[in-house]
Regions:
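Acidic carboxylate diad motif detector
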Residues: 52-162, 207, 301
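A generic secondary-structure signal for well-formed alpha-helical elements
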Residues: 34, 41, 83, 87-90, ...
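Short amphipathic alpha-helical coiled-coil/interface segments
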Residues: 30, 75-83, 241-247, 308
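Flexible coil/linker segments and helix-coil junctions enriched in charged and small residues
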Residues: 41-44, 54, 90-103, 223-239
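Gly/serine-rich nucleotide phosphate-binding loop at the start of the catalytic core
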Residues: 1-80, 96, 430
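Positively charged, helix-rich recognition surfaces that bind polyanionic ligands
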Residues: 3-9, 166-431
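Stable alpha-helical structural segments in soluble proteins, enriched in small hydrophobic residues
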Residues: 33, 37, 71-87, 363-377
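Generic detection of short hydrophobic beta-strand segments and adjacent strand-loop junctions
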Residues: 6-17, 129-137, 203-207
Length: 431
């Protein structure tokens, strides 16, 4: 049994100037408290929330007696998190300065500082008393509110001074129970596609990350050349135009849709998801073998870890078990003979050097991940006896294990189930 948390961002209705000024004053006092606590925590090494609260609570209460007392608690939590993050970055040699800076502030609230007044409004405790804030709600909020999710006691608010609004970060939680898996789904993520092996059938989801990355790369380059020529390198207009590009949103949308498809299959079949055991920064390890600047840039932007993280988050939300297998040589070794697969002329289809079988490199990677998961994770999933691998060396043999079913991005990105993404009925599987 695990508890899963998700954050939903909602905005308030535009606030009157007098009411918004109350939150501007509250933010100023909150910022001063956090700055004071962060500098103290880094200087003295006291980064524990409990210890920091014990040492600084009375001082904060004497400095800001007009604030509700629990703001002293939440500022200590905020400062403790910031101090730990700064010291970790400083230890890795990535800190730009020797002391932390508080640039952006989100006001942390606990159950004594805010509450739901109704389904469309909340109340926030300030130095002027309790204030009612009306919310502009959207589809995602109602999706969580009308399901098994419950609103957590903690929340955050941020000020949008251009529109005189509050941005509220609501946390929803629910309890999920993991099931006893009856099989495996192996997933192999690459730069331009992701391969998924389900019940002996391989599906190749075309993500087109390479085209998206290069398209935005050349677009940014043209924008920079155009505005640098007339306005200079640090012009505000160019920055605003570049901020309007939606590369991150497009890639994030594809990641979550792909993760949703994989997890829905696993839930319906009660399977475990098998992923590659990647390092902390797999792209950095991969680019060490390449000198082409454009290829290195593409690998950095391909988000191998990001796709895995999306699958992990979705799996945690639905209680799907996830296991990891060593990805070393998964696309080079034949799963039948444990011998090398020879690829010629940069082809994605290779031949086993011992048995002569033809293998697609993404399909064989999924099979090897599946084999390693079944041999090494000790789960309740079926043993190797149920694994069906076509050993026929004849091209396009009876089951054609080397040839995956390719699904273009225009098909699967519209839907949320694998069955709906298959164009032909003959390719469909029963989910």
């Amino acid at each position: 049994v695990n508890e899963v948390a998700r954050t939903v961002i909602v905005r308030s209705t535009p606030l009157p100037r007098k009411l918004f000024r109350v939150f501007v004053e509250l933010e100023g006092m909150y910022r001063n408290m956090v700055e004071q606590l962060v500098l103290y925590a880094v200087r003295t090494g006291v980064i524990s929330f409990t210890r920091l609260k014990a040492l600084k609570y009375r001082e904060l209460r004497s400095q800001y007696p007009q604030l509700p007392s629990h703001y002293a608690y939440t500022t200590c939590q905020d400062a403790s998190t910031r101090a730990k993050s700064f010291l970790r970055v400083k230890k890795e040699g990535l800190a730009k300065r020797g002391y932390p800076e508080v640039n952006r502030v989100s006001i942390w609230l606990d159950d004594h500082l805010w509450r739901m007044k109704s389904l469309t409004s909340i109340e926030i405790a300030t130095h002027k008393g309790w204030v009612v804030i009306e919310l502009e709600l959207h589809k995602l909020f109602w999706k969580y509110m009308n399901s098994e999710w419950r609103v957590a006691s903690e929340a955050k608010i941020k000020l949008n001074k251009w529109e005189r609004r509050l941005v509220i970060y609501l946390v929803f939680k629910k309890i999920v129970e993991a099931y006893r898996p009856r099989g495996f789904i192996s997933v192999d993520v690459n730069e331009n596609h992701a391969a998924v092996l389900v019940d002996g059938k391989a599906y190749l989801f075309k993500t087109d990350f390479r085209d998206i990355i290069l398209g935005y790369y050349y677009r940014r380059k043209r924008i920079q050349e155009k505005y640098d020529k007339f306005y200079g390198a640090s012009c505000r207009v160019k920055k605003k135009v570049l901020e309007g590009l939606k590369e991150r949103e497009r890639k994030s949308n594809l990641k979550w849709k792909l993760a949703n498809i994989v997890v829905r299959i696993a839930v319906d079949k009660q399977y475990t998801i098998v992923l590659e055991r990647l390092g902390k920064n797999p792209a950095k390890e991969m680019v060490n073998h390449f000198r082409d600047d454009q290829l290195r840039y593409r690998i950095y932007q391909a988000s191998f870890k990001g796709v895995q993280r999306a699958v992990e988050e979705k799996a945690r939300e639905h209680g799907v078990p996830v296991v990891y297998a060593d990805p070393r040589n998964t696309s080079r070794m034949c799963p039948i003979h444990s011998s090398l697969i020879v690829y010629e002329n940069d082809s994605r289809v290779g031949r086993c050097s011992r048995g002569g079988e033809l293998w697609h490199r993404d399909v064989v990677a999924c099979y090897n991940l599946l084999l390693r998961a079944r041999l090494g994770n000790g789960s309740n999933a079926p043993s190797l006896g149920g694994l069906k691998v076509d050993g026929s060396p004849v091209p396009l043999g009876s089951t054609a294990t080397y040839e995956p079913t390719e699904i273009s991005r225009s098909l699967w990105a519209r839907w949320k189930s694998l069955d709906a993404t298959n164009k032909n009925k003959s390719m469909r599987i029963s989910i």
